[in-house]
């Protein structure tokens, strides 16, 4: 067996390498330093007020964190989705709400990066990648949820424009200026179609933010479209092409959701570890007790398993050859990592004991944040159905 191993190594010139490259380490360190210096000190304020300070947005933009995976020619940092995962993990460790804002932004930009024309990319991606604008992705509706076959938002062709009417629910970043990818049924194909709409155009309005349980700062709002006039040149990938955009775009979105959950797991791990060393009982840190040691071990195991699965998804996203297989990998990663964040948050809370129930402690915020992941970008059972469908079809 060893002989075969060395033959393969010699033939291919290398073996599987789990070390981060210099470029990846640089992205990780940059995001970590920014998160610790600027986000962590105001994380509780963000959570309390459900608003991300503009100086945080400006700082993220200066570091090109809004455009890490995208090409430089469109204002991006050309850091790949692997770099995106590393940065998002560090941002999410400090604030799930800030990470959620970036994740939703990149969900929209990933759809543009694959399906937009050159002109559309330059017009809409460039300011968004630079952080001058923040993008949104508007699919979910009040009565029909996230079912593309039941969309009620309409797009009626009127000369060289479309007139959009409808309501979208739980839309991230809807209050920030920038492009919003809106899905509506057009009257020509009677199928879902993606439209690039500029937020705050005539007929565009929003609700107050929903008061959700966690990920505060990453606001969710309803979007109201009343006779919104959209140029035909703003159709994404052509009339009736909404479903492929949704399928692949949301798969890319799960890279961000998984990375955000991974950062939450790391935060739960670090908070539990720190508290176990600091909290004294009978003149010794509680880390001396075997029951606490078992919980710390579980946190370490869960973090490492989630970390490598998420890092792998980032690498896969750099070169998607088969959208169906990528959908499977994105779904299984998102399911595992988001479920694991729930488990890790609970374990860390158990280590804290009654103090974990107090909002003064970060672990309480992590616990409430953990509930969000399994419900967004497709609920957990739907993700399992995607995994099963592709697996059984092979």
Each predicted region: which residue ranges?
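Aromatic (phenylalanine/tyrosine) cluster motif
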Residues: 5-6
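Alpha-helical interface subdomain recognition
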Residues: 9-94, 98, 115-119, 129-132, ...
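Short Gly/Pro-enriched turn/cap motifs at secondary-structure boundaries
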Residues: 128, 143-146, 170-173, 185-186, ...
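A short, Trp-centered hydrophobic/proline-enriched beta-strand micro-motif
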Residues: 131-139
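Flexible, small-/acidic-enriched active-site or ligand-binding loops
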Residues: 150, 202-231
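A short core secondary-structure module
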Residues: 161, 165-206
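Long, acidic (Asp/Glu-rich), low-complexity accessory segments flanking structured domains
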Residues: 227-244
